Swiss-Prot record:
The gene is EDS1. CDD domains: Lipase. The active site is at 123 (nucleophile), 187 (charge relay system), 317 (charge relay system). It comes from the Eukaryota. The modification N-acetylalanine is found at residue 2. The N-terminal domain (1-384) is necessary and sufficient for interaction with SAG101. The lineage of its organism: Eukaryota, Viridiplantae, Streptophyta, Embryophyta, Tracheophyta. It comes from Arabidopsis thaliana (Mouse-ear cress). This is Protein EDS1L.
Length: 623
């Protein structure tokens, strides 16, 4: 029961997944099984070198960035970095989901029938299952999580597929819980992609042939197996040690020197890993801890054992049948740092140092959770919320009553309230910059970046306070000294807040903010090729409503002919910004606002055809 509560799968589903994974060896691409309310898709593994490291990929680890259009969630929202995956595994997925196969139609049928879908596979078939699950989540589940059933991904001895961003994105979207990866203690396959291609290229073809269960037996005297195992674990050791140094903030001089010129594998564990020993199953869902365990569970206790482990690493890849059959007789431990981890790690042969590193990874996650709690305590405090409320409910309305709005009032800063607003602006910036610092250093849980309450607060803050930052920037003439606000002055806290909001509202449609923006611009019929428009709008403020005033400031000092495309783009975006709450309609059309004063100077022909003419009818009539 504890296992099912943690992973969402029971023994029967695991048994059926393994059975389907075996059947996939006999099919081309994938095998489908259906029983009751569950449909299982099992993927055929390959033991060809090209299906582990794509021969056309020249990088040291065969990696490639995911397509942002096809996988819009698989990135860091704030920084915008896209997840990296193994290209050979990705090509296997692309071959499966090719419209010429029956796979997509079969998935569609299961979706319409409201059946739970399980993706599974052994070895590299498990890698395909992982990517197929992400494909399903992006294509179906994210559109309406209340309608589409949660998928499950169950793998047996699968290699690592994606990088830390891949793992982070799954955590942020709360998808990590859908992935359960079974690993026997010495199985080499989950460690293979931690090695450089150059380290294993000579021995990999032979070892893959030995890993194929359709081969008769492992050649235990084969020196190439020992060479392969040694190379993989040497690179795994470097990756694990570098990772723990980054995690704890310590630095071993030799590792610092190594990392400066030696490329390290980008691949990292994702989801829940279930390590198996003779006595127990040990479940871990902390990616940093799993990485350490992939190295330290594969170590020998003495010289005699060391000589046997390379061949055990092959045999263990063939032992998942035994694992599945014996699950009901084994103890179950969840390695979360709350309970004693000694017995679990002892069974897995983890050394004292290894236990320290695993514990450090678990403790680091606790610190992330504590950091999040502290942030929540701060932003829920009455004095914090009062700062936002004062700007929103007192300062802004009083400025609007004077017919010039809070942007223009703050830009001049002649009143005592303007000074008070500046103090509150600085105090709020301090809080949000502290959060940003924690995000950049990965010192918050993955889920935080996608937390709806945080996104709402950050959006409220951005919409309300960024105009004050823009006013302050131009009041001090920084645009003349430093350059345009959008190019040189925009604080990162607003960029992160903007991207978080855009991701939240667009992900149900599987869309990317950048593409949505350019589609809107293209629909404005500006009379230029899109490439020309993109060059013209580079670093403009038309991509975000809270940057409205920055764009106005840039446009008002330039001849209309020079900025016509930017003017029309700004006008074309404005109505939607007003509807969405990005721009305050009452603020920008006030009699004394910078925007209104600038707009009335535009050519009469432009004004008479402007989408804003209804708002500015008096000005058009007067001119």
């Amino acid at each position: 029961m504890a296992f099912e509560a943690l992973t969402g799968i029971n023994g029967d589903l695991i048994t059926r997944s393994w059975s389907a994974s075996k059947q996939a060896y006999l099919t081309e691409r994938y095998h489908k099984e259906e029983a009751g309310a569950v449909v299982i898709f099992a993927f055929q593994p390959s033991f060809s070198e090209k299906d582990f490291f794509d021969p056309d990929n020249k990088s040291s680890f065969g990696e490639i960035k995911l397509n942002r259009v096809q996988f819009p969630c698989m990135r860091k929202i704030g920084k915008g970095d896209v997840a990296t995956v193994n290209e050979a595994f990705l090509k296997n997925l692309e071959a499966v989901i090719d419209p010429r196969t029956s796979f997509q139609a079969s998935v569609e049928m299961a979706v319409r029938s409201r059946k739970q879908i399980v993706f599974t596979g052994h070895s590299s078939g498990g890698a395909t299952a992982i990517l197929a699950t992400v494909w399903y989540l992006e294509k179906y589940f994210i559109r309406n999580p209340n309608v589409y059933l949660e998928p499950r991904c169950v793998t047996f001895g699968a290699p690592l597929v994606g990088d830390s961003i891949f793992s982070h994105a799954l955590g942020r979207e709360k998808w990590s819980r859908f992935f359960v990866n079974f690993v026997t203690r010495f199985d080499i396959v989950p460690r293979i992609t931690l090695a450089r291609k150059a380290s294993v290229e000579e021995t990999l073809p032979h070892v893959l042939a030995q890993l194929d269960p359709r081969n008769s037996s492992v050649q235990e005297s084969e020196q190439r197996i020992t060479e392969f195992y040694t190379s993989v674990m040497r690179d795994t050791s470097t990756v694990a040690n570098q990772a723990v140094c980054e995690l704890t903030g310590s630095a071993e001089a030799i590792l610092e020197t190594l990392s400066s010129f030696l490329e390290l594998s980008p691949y990292r564990p994702a989801g829940t890993f279930v390590f198996s020993t003779e006595k127990r199953l040990v479940a871990v869902n902390n990616s940093d801890a799993i990485l350490q365990m992939l190295f330290y569970t594969c170590q020998a206790s003495d010289e005699q054992e060391w000589s046997l482990i390379p061949f055990r690493s092959i045999r263990d890849h063939h032992s998942y049948e035994e694992l599945v059959q014996s699950m009901g007789m084994k103890l179950f431990n969840h390695l979360d740092g709350e309970n004693s981890i000694e017995s679990s790690l002892n069974d897995l042969g983890v050394s004292t140092r290894g236990r320290q590193y695993v514990q450090a990874a678990l403790e680091e996650e606790k610190k992330r959770v504590e950091n999040q709690k502290k942030i929540i305590q701060v932003i829920q405090q009455e004095r914090f919320l009062k700062k936002l409320a004062w700007i929103e409910d007192e300062y802004k309305p009083k400025c609007q009553a004077h017919k010039n709005g809070y942007y223009d009032s703050f830009k001049v800063s002649n009143e005592e309230n303007d000074f008070k607003a500046n103090v509150k602006r600085a105090e709020l910036a301090g809080v949000f910059d502290e959060v940003l610092g924690l995000l950049k250093k990965c010192q918050l849980p993955d889920e935080f970046e996608g937390d709806i309450d945080w996104i709402k607060l950050a959006t409220r803050y951005r919409r309300l306070v960024e105009p004050l930052d823009i006013a302050n920037y131009h009041r001090h003439l920084k645009n003349e000294d430093t350059g345009p606000y959008m190019k040189r002055g925009r604080p990162t806290r607003y960029i992160y807040a903007q991207r978080g909001y855009e991701h939240h509202i667009l992900k149900p449609n599987g869309m990317i903010a950048e593409d949505v923006f350019w589609n809107k611009v293209n629909g404005l019929n500006l009379g230029l090729q899109l490439e020309e428009i993109q060059e013209t709008l580079k670093n403009s403020g038309s991509e975000c409503g809270s940057c409205f005033w920055a764009e106005v400031e840039e446009l008002k000092g330039k001849p209309y002919e020079e900025v016509e495309v930017r003017v029309k783009t700004l006008e074309g975006m404005l109505r939607e910004w007003i509807t969405a709450g990005e721009v305050d309609e009452k603020e920008i059309f006030l009699e004394g606002s910078t925007f209104r004063k600038w707009w009335i100077t535009l050519p009469k022909n432009h004004k008479s055809h402007s989408p804003l003419r209804d708002y500015m009818m008096d000005e058009i009539t007067d001119t």
